[in-house]
Swiss-Prot record:
This is N-(5'-phosphoribosyl)anthranilate isomerase. HAMAP family: PRAI (MF_00135). Keywords: Amino-acid biosynthesis, Aromatic amino acid biosynthesis, Isomerase, Tryptophan biosynthesis. It catalyses: N-(5-phospho-beta-D-ribosyl)anthranilate = 1-(2-carboxyphenylamino)-1-deoxy-D-ribulose 5-phosphate. It comes from Pseudomonas syringae pv. syringae (strain B728a).
Length: 206
């Protein structure tokens, strides 16, 4: 099996982005959802991206953003990939002509395979924990047994991952990538360098 990729999401500070890169993360996530405690402005995002070393993928997270808002962000910020956490339709996601992943908050009875088929142009599906009224960043895990074995898209596993459980998650789910936010924080939006290092060591089995 190929090495599992990793994304540190909810980055709000340059020092946290650099800590993620130095620890071996493949990507960082920048939240463009004003209601989130991890939200960044365009100016913050540009400063963070400008400080990154080469080959770190920058992912912009959006929740039901208007086309105007999203286009303004894309014009101002050099994002490599989009991540949609709201009720965006496949047509809306496709309309920006950027690589994207679609997030699904998983609960019993969800047709995850059907979502993958519906969002046929998505590069992957991000599976997160369902908490009513919260689009992501809950800090809670979900039942990984709900994930089908035969999905036709790369799975990015999120939801309550920490250095204590990510190795088990990788062994059970065998995802393409893992995504962490709260599990490597001191407080919402403020990352902890030691927690990032511990998480990445667990991902890499070192």
């Amino acid at each position: 099996m190929s090495a599992v990729r990793s994304k540190i999401c909810g980055i709000t500070r340059i020092e946290d982005a650099l800590a993620a890169a130095e620890a071996g993360a493949d990507a960082i996530g920048l939240v463009f959802y004003p209601k989130s405690p991890r939200a960044v402005t365009v100016l913050q995002a540009r400063a963070i991206i400008a400080a990154l070393p080469p080959f770190i993928t920058t992912v912009g997270l959006f929740v039901n953003a208007s086309r105007c808002e999203l286009n303004e962000t894309l014009d101002a910020v050099a994002l490599d990939m989009l991540q949609f956490h709201g009720d965006e339709t496949p047509e809306e996601c496709d309309g920006y002509h950027r690589p994207y992943v679609k997030a699904l908050r998983v609960k019993a009875g969800d047709d995850i395979a059907g979502v993958c088929r519906t969002y046929r142009n998505a590069r992957g599906v991000l599976l997160d924990t369902y908490v009513e009224g919260v689009p992501g960043g809950t800090g809670e895990t979900f039942d990984w047994a709900l994930i089908p074995d035969d999905l036709d898209k790369p799975v990015i596993l999120a939801g309550g991952l920490t250095s204590a459980n990510v190795a088990q998650a990788i062994a059970q789910v065998r995802p393409y990538a893992v995504d962490v936010s709260g599990g490597v924080e001191k407080s919402k939006g403020i990352k902890d360098r030691e927690k990032i290092l511990a998480f990445m060591s667990a991902v890499h089995g070192t």
